[in-house]
Amino acid sequence: MAFKGVLNDADVTAALDGCKSAFDHKAFFKACGLAAKSADDIKKAFAIIDQDKSGFIEEDELKLFLQNFCAGARALSDAETKAFLKAGDSDGDGKIGVDEFAAMVKH
């Protein structure tokens, strides 16, 4: 698992189970334990999710967000992806930077 040492496997499994039918980023971050983690751990999570290492999480990476936690997890729907991007993209540039991600995880 990519998040070994950052998140508890059982918490991640429970969080993934909770979003099989609908994705709510706030509920997911809380359930998987990321919301309670340190700034350094949140940056580590960001680096894992930023698949192309661009320094940003773009829409295509958000669509596959859950698969970072478990390879067999579902892709987010287009509507879920757009809502997730809108929630995290505070400066309106169409992508989520590390500071935006940290703010989204914590709130």
Curated annotation (Swiss-Prot):
Pfam family, one: EF-hand_7
Listed CDD domains: EFh_parvalbumin_beta (cd16255)
Keywords carried by this UniProt record: Allergen, Calcium, Metal-binding, Muscle protein, Repeat
One Gene Ontology cellular component: cytoplasm
Gene Ontology MF terms in the entry: calcium ion binding
Domain of life per record: Eukaryota
Residue positions binding Ca(2+) 1: 50, 52, 54, 56, 58, 61
Residues at which Ca(2+) 2 binds: 89, 91, 93, 95, 100
Organ and tissue specificity: Expressed in both white and dark muscles (at protein level). About five times lower expression in the dark muscle than in the white muscle (at protein level).
Stretches assigned to the EF-hand domain: 37-72, 76-107
The protein's role, per its UniProt record: In muscle, parvalbumin is thought to be involved in relaxation after contraction. It binds two calcium ions.
Family stated for the protein in its record: Belongs to the parvalbumin family.
Protein name (database record): Parvalbumin beta
